[in-house]
């Protein structure tokens, strides 16, 4: 049951399984990219705050890093490396 026990038997099992996966990722702590500590928590939709270095950043709605953001960051890093050569 876990985090979706608050819904009881309502909404169906498959929907509760999807919500469970989302809520677990939403409420978990993430590693801060600035200080490296596991203190990044979600404050609101897309707003993430580090309790250690007190930085507030914009991220994904349910996870700190979205897959598209990771793709863009790696492309930018690759282009910078090509520019430096």
Curated annotation (Swiss-Prot):
GO terms for cellular component: cytosolic large ribosomal subunit. Coiled coil: none annotated. Its main location: cytoplasm. Transmembrane segments: none annotated. Zn(2+) binds at residues 32, 35, 50, 53. Keywords: Cytoplasm, Metal-binding, Ribonucleoprotein, Ribosomal protein, Zinc, Zinc-finger. One of its GO terms (molecular function) is zinc ion binding. GO terms for biological process: translation. The keyword Metal-binding applies. It is found in: Cytoplasm. A zinc finger (C4-type) spans 32-53. InterPro entries: Ribosomal_eL37/eL43, Ribosomal_eL43, Ribosomal_zn-bd. Pfam families: Ribosomal_L37ae (PF01780). Component of the large ribosomal subunit. The ribosome is a large ribonucleoprotein complex responsible for the synthesis of proteins in the cell. Belongs to the eukaryotic ribosomal protein eL43 family. NCBIfam families: eL43_euk_arch. Component of the large ribosomal subunit. This is Large ribosomal subunit protein eL43. It comes from Myxine glutinosa. The lineage of its organism: Eukaryota, Metazoa, Chordata, Craniata, Vertebrata.
């Amino acid at each position: 049951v876990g985090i979706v026990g608050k819904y009881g038997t309502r909404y169906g099992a498959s929907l509760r399984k999807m919500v469970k996966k989302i809520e677990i990722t939403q409420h978990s702590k993430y590693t801060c990219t600035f200080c490296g500590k596991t203190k990044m928590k979600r404050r609101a939709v897309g707003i993430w705050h580090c309790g250690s270095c007190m930085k507030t950043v914009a991220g994904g709605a349910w996870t700190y890093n979205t897959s598209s953001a990771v793709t863009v960051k790696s492309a930018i890093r690759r282009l910078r490396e090509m520019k430096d050569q």
